[in-house]
Regions:
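Alpha-helical cap/lid subdomain in secreted, periplasmic
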Residues: 63-188
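Bacterial Sec-dependent N-terminal signal peptides
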Residues: 1-8
């Protein structure tokens, strides 16, 4: 029996500034090291990128095929999954499916992990007039959760419920600000 066996995982992060803010993959790797585990990672992350953008970005495809990844983490643009179900189905779902299917085609053993994000601190003011459910943090968070869980279920993938943990932490520790001043990106504490 191996006691203290080291775990080594290879993870590709595909997303945008929510991932590269505060060098999140390195933070996770450092956390793994505290347990003598190893996280080898790469990333295809560009500020503001949607799943559609990644589907048309050669670097994303190159990185998907560059390794036998244990996990590929897929994180959508922060607002898109909070839009109406019809809009998500038309503008986000097809590209989430294309990325998921491409990861599985490159290596059937890779587990796709959808990174369920958090709502903006006070909701999405820009899109509130056209879709009122996103006018508040709670409304936006509920829509994000619904969309990411639909991706997970539709594609038989996994989901990292980051936004669910974020909401719980926000409720338990309201004095700790998880957001940068833009009320969208994570502070160091948020990451």
């Amino acid at each position: 029996i191996l006691l203290n066996a080291q775990i080594k995982k290879k993870v590709l992060f595909i997303g945008n500034s929510y991932i590269y803010a505060n060098t999140l993959p390195q933070m996770i790797s450092d956390l793994a090291l505290t347990k003598q585990d190893t996280l080898l990672f790469d990333q295809s992350v560009v500020g503001g990128f949607t799943f559609n953008n990644h589907c048309n970005f050669p670097q994303t495809w190159q990185k998907i095929r560059s390794n036998s990844w244990d996990f590929v983490v897929l994180q959508a643009q922060s607002q898109e999954p909070s839009f109406s179900p019809a809009q998500v189905m038309a503008n986000t779902y097809p590209f989430a499916k294309q990325l998921n299917d491409s990861v599985k085609a490159a290596n059937p053993c890779t587990e796709v992990l959808f990174f369920l994000t958090w709502g903006r601190k006070n909701g999405d003011a820009m899109n509130c007039p056209v879709y009122p459910p996103v006018c508040t943090y709670n409304g936006m968070q509920a829509r994000l959760r619904e969309s990411y869980m639909a991706f997970k279920d539709s594609f038989k993938a996994a989901c990292a419920p980051v936004g669910v943990a974020w909401k719980r932490f926000r409720n338990l520790y309201p004095l700790i600000d998880l957001y940068q001043p833009d009320e969208s990106h994570p502070s160091v504490e948020g990451s």
